[in-house]
Amino acid sequence: FEYRETIKRLALLSGDYPAIEGVLLDDMSSIGIDKGFRPEHIREIRRLLDEGCPRIKTWGVVYTMNFNRPDINEYMRELDVISLWTWHARDVVNLEQNVLRVRESFPEKPIVVGLYLYDYGEGRRMPMDLLKLQCGTALALLEGKQIQGLVFLTIDNDAEAVEWTT
């Protein structure tokens, strides 16, 4: 895992585009770990960011289905922002519990909740009742200041889901 050149390019871009706030380590808690990504890699990314563009934060995608992976808390500890996603729509009923679990372990870390409009875990349309539950729960968590933001993964192949969320 080599990030030096990418972070050099990011440092140049971030000077011209102050809206760039962070880097996102997508699929960190699943594919990344499977390919050998370790907490020390996050530390190295943060060190390089501190040298070249210190205002840029390190965000990492953590899937709730990966909570039981060995050392997952060590990965989350190294992040500046935890981007929490529920892969299987059937598990959105546990969204509040999952946020509180992360909040208890890392009370100082910002958490943003990722919201899918598609059930990637089952490879199907997101059932509307679960979409509404997911969005309603996330909004309540945001209003209650348990999370700091929401991220929608948008799609354009399910008109009903898109229309409901707009």
Where are these regions (language model features)?
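Glycan-processing catalytic domains of CAZymes
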Residues: 1-166
